[in-house]
């Protein structure tokens, strides 16, 4: 609401999955994934056709939509697929108007195909970069997250000490 967004879309891919996983617990494998979040906080997970069952098993978000825009880069035809649309997703999270403001976080992880799909679905929408929202959200850490980070660094330090002991000219 502070950014005057009707929807925030956070996208991820196999190599950089953290943002979609942050909200959903799901991370894509060879496809892309996105989370659409309304200003009221209602959310939906968007995945490609190959991720339907994995997403249903892993996601903490119950609303899961299969969009062709999130398919793998090999661009399979999927003749049997009746895909969901961005309009379906937005309607499910309570965004029904057409003239809206859409923030896209993980902008660099948003493929041209995904962006074209958003623009085609909402030609009157204002689409803005919203990476700063994800950066701000992920910079706040809980006590458990801090403990996990400390443990990760402790393990990495032990591994480095072992490597240094093993190195020979």
Identify the residue ranges that each predicted region occupies:
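C-terminal helix-coil-helix/basic helical segment that borders enzyme active sites and/or dimer interfaces
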Residues: 161-169
């Amino acid at each position: 609401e502070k950014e005057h967004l009707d929807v925030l879309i956070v996208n991820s891919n196999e190599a950089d999955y953290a943002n979609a996983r942050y909200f959903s617990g799901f991370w894509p494998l060879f496809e892309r994934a996105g989370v659409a979040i309304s200003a009221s906080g209602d959310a939906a997970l968007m995945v490609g056709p190959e991720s339907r069952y994995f997403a249903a098993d892993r996601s903490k978000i119950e609303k899961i939509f299969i969009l062709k825009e999130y398919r793998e880069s090999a661009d399979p035809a999927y003749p049997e697929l009746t895909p969901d649309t961005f309009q379906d997703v937005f309607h499910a999270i309570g965004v029904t108007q057409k003239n809206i403001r859409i923030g896209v976080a993980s902008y660099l992880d948003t493929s041209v195909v995904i962006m074209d799909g958003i623009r085609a679905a909402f030609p009157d929408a204002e689409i803005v970069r919203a990476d700063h929202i994800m950066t701000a959200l992920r910079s706040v850490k809980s006590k458990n997250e801090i403990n996990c980070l400390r443990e990760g660094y402790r393990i990495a330090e032990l591994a480095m000490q072992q490597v240094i002991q093993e190195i020979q000219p």
